[in-house]
Regions:
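Short glycine/proline-enriched turn or capping motifs at secondary-structure junctions
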Residues: 13-17, 110-111, 115
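Short loop/beta submotifs within extracellular cysteine-rich repeat domains
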Residues: 125-126
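DNA-contacting interfaces and partner/effector-binding or oligomerization modules
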Residues: 1-59, 64
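Short, charged, surface-exposed hinge/linker loops at domain edges
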Residues: 5, 46-97, 101-103, 107-114, ...
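DNA-binding alpha-helical recognition surfaces that contact promoter or target DNA
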Residues: 42, 101, 119
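Short, basic, alpha-helical segments at the C-terminal edge of helix-turn-helix-like DNA-binding modules
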Residues: 116-122
Length: 134
């Protein structure tokens, strides 16, 4: 099964999200757009289904693929909308105003800042995983 990376992002200054993937085995690229990360993913998946139908009509065999989604910071907070920007910013020690700018796509974090944000989110996930509820 071919593993395909789908990039979900919102460019600085854009209102819509995009989701893009390239399926090398059939030399096809698919782009989805939407006002949310979920909508962009759904649009991309619909485009992939349409592409598979077109390829079948042309007699091209399409094997199943495994899609792995990658997100920029803004798309991550939009897709996982239960993640609180203020809470994450407190956890990792970044100004909540700056985090909101990253989440809304007004600014892009540096590579180092992005790594710090991802590390903080993973730290929060570990804390939640270890929580005992009675």
């Amino acid at each position: 099964m071919e593993k395909v990376i789908a990039r979900v992002e919102r460019e600085v200054g854009e209102k819509n999200f995009s989701c893009y993937m390239k399926v090398k085995s059939v030399n096809a690229s698919v782009l989805g757009l939407g006002n949310t990360a979920n909508a962009a993913i759904a649009d991309m998946l619909q485009g992939w289904n349409d592409t598979k139908e077109d390829l079948k009509e042309d007699g091209i065999e399409v094997s199943p693929i495994e899609i792995e989604y990658t997100f920029d910071i803004g798309a991550l907070f939009n897709y996982y909308d239960f993640i609180n920007v203020a809470g994450v910013s407190r956890e990792i020690g970044i100004s909540s105003a700056v985090m909101r700018q990253y989440a809304t796509g007004v600014r892009r974090p540096s590579k180092e800042r992005k790594e710090r944000i991802v590390k903080g989110i993973k730290s929060l996930a570990k804390k939640m995983e270890m929580a005992k509820v009675y």
